[in-house]
């Protein structure tokens, strides 16, 4: 899953508007919308803010993992 789809799904699953999430990353609603639609790139500092806000790992957010939280090591 690509990160834009994950962004939208996380926002919708938490019953949030684009404007509400845009405030978290200090963007306008339009700026946030452009990221979700693929017309602008998500900056790394905004990725970190969103991961902290949603309490998910960056691997999950960008689609590397299907697990929202870091898996414990089997050591």
What are these regions (language model features)?
Residues 25, 36, 54, 65:
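DNA major-groove recognition helix of helix-turn-helix
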Residues 7, 21-22, 32-35, 61:
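Conserved hydrophobic/aromatic packing and binding residues within compact polymer-binding modules
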Residues 26-41:
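Recognition helix of helix-turn-helix/homeodomain-like DNA-binding domains
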Residues 7, 18, 29, 44-47:
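Helix-turn-helix DNA-binding elements, focusing on the entry/boundary residues of the two helices
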């Amino acid at each position: 899953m690509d990160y834009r789809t994950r962004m939208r799904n996380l926002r919708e699953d938490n019953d949030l508007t684009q404007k509400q999430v845009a405030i978290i990353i200090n963007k306008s609603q339009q700026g946030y919308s452009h990221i979700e639609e693929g017309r602008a790139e998500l900056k790394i500092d905004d990725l970190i803010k969103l991961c902290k806000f949603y309490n998910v790992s960056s691997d999950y957010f960008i689609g590397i993992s299907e697990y929202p939280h870091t898996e414990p090591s089997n050591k």
